[in-house]
Amino acid sequence: MKYFVVALALVAAFACIAESKPAESEHELAEVEEENELADLEDAVWLEHLADLSDLEEARGFFGNTWKKIKGKADKIMLKKAVKIMVKKEGISKEEAQAKVDAMSKKQIRLYLLKHYGKKALQKASEKL
């Protein structure tokens, strides 16, 4: 769970970096205006904005790939946890539990884990009372 939280924090940091824009100065706008021979300052701002879009697209591509990797690892961890819980709870062999988990959809696995951990949290809360 700690690793998932750390990974989620890293993803959020990458998203913030991808969305951040450098401060626009008059000097930069003047250079853009001179390069493109633009008389209007609004056109220079628009062109600079277009130049920034390509950087954002690259960052979004990186963010999307990173998110897919994290999601894949989280799915693998959920599968392993579901197998461990079934072995312990139902008293069956690891191979049988693995076969049951393989037959379940990802949504069913998530629901199974939520039920298990929900009951566990409820038991701990009732013990404290």
From Swiss-Prot:
Pfam family, one: Latarcin
Entry keyword set: Antibiotic, Antimicrobial, Cytolysis, Hemolysis, Secreted, Signal, Toxin
Swiss-Prot/TrEMBL GO biological process terms: cytolysis by host of symbiont cells; defense response to Gram-negative bacterium; defense response to Gram-positive bacterium
This protein's GO CC annotations: extracellular region
Chief location: secreted
Positions of short motif Processing quadruplet motif: 57-60
Propeptide: 21-60
Disulphide-bonded residues: none
PTM comment: Cleavage of the propeptide depends on the processing quadruplet motif (XXXR, with at least one of X being E).
Task of the protein: Insecticidal, cytolytic and antimicrobial peptide. Has insecticidal activity against the flesh fly S.carnaria. Has antibacterial activity against the Gram-negative bacteria E.coli. Forms voltage-dependent, ion-permeable channels in membranes. At high concentration causes cell membrane lysis.
Family according to the record: Belongs to the cationic peptide 06 (cytoinsectotoxin) family.
Protein name stated in the entry: M-zodatoxin-Lt8f
Gene that this polypeptide is encoded by: cit 1-7
